């Protein structure tokens, strides 16, 4: 979605952007005037190869995204410029410098209000041409940026800041209507997933948005990542489900306090079952995220967690391996302790072990992950 938003900025600046998602599309044969790539850690090597190939053809390259933002010195070996952080406020300058042949090595974005971000009607035609638009079961929106939590394994606040900036509810309604037109193949009740890191970071806003969807009359089923606070608030949960909430992804992360303390998470495992039951009673499903590899966990954690998750009736479980992503407190701690075993970024995928676990081997951790999925 980030590239689509930047495409809108490029159009405003008089450029003719073409957005390519390599999950679904082949690269065009045409040589562009400028190549802009967004880089996640797990695809960094692939992005660097592509950037090198474009530069070999004389095409200037700009890299952005989480990985390039947090390891710019590495990224700069493969590009002309790095844009660090949110690019919205600086991308116009980047394009102007590119047109003048005067790209700077580094650009630093700054935070801005969400109502200043281009709305999706400015790039919906691009999305409508993508192959995914013909068969995807959902469309996506972002209503907030930032997070009020500070989990050790997460880099969100390094990129989007602490706290929550959100779009006016009426703006979100208009964007839902645009997505319903793009996704006409989905029928009357389109499904929208809010990409926010925590839609419930501001419970008042979550309530206002739910009420706005209800009062607008727009028919939509929606899902979101949300912290446990939404499940605790019975009245708000009821309003959200009436407005169309059907799926909540909650990062439970662990079932024992030691693991949660280690990652600076304030969840209370003893209430998980009650909260899942409340969400089900309200009419929504639960996708739960659980992480393996914390120092307090031994080889018995996989079956224990799978049984626990099954007993509390989580609908879909997402098990993963603790991954020390650059820019996180987990990365800094493991790097200082010389526990990181590889910097092969493609292995930073949440399913491979890239560090030395405290109470098991790396092989046990990877095998245990598969065990948890089988047991659940």
Each model region followed by its residue ranges:
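Short, hinge-like loop/turn segments at secondary-structure boundaries
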Residues: 36, 78-82, 100-101, 240, ...
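Structural recognition of alpha->loop->beta junctions
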Residues: 74-92, 239-248, 304-319
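Structured beta->alpha junctions
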Residues: 39, 43, 67, 83, ...
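Short amphipathic alpha-helical segments and helix-helix/interface helices
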Residues: 7, 48-52, 72-73, 95, ...
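Structural detector of well-ordered beta-strand residues that form the stable sheet scaffold
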Residues: 62-63, 83, 223, 287, ...
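Acidic, low-complexity intrinsically disordered segments
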Residues: 1-184, 359, 364
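Radical SAM [4Fe-4S] cluster-binding motif and immediate context
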Residues: 121-289, 294, 303-307
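C-terminal accessory regions of radical SAM enzymes
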Residues: 303, 307-316, 323-376
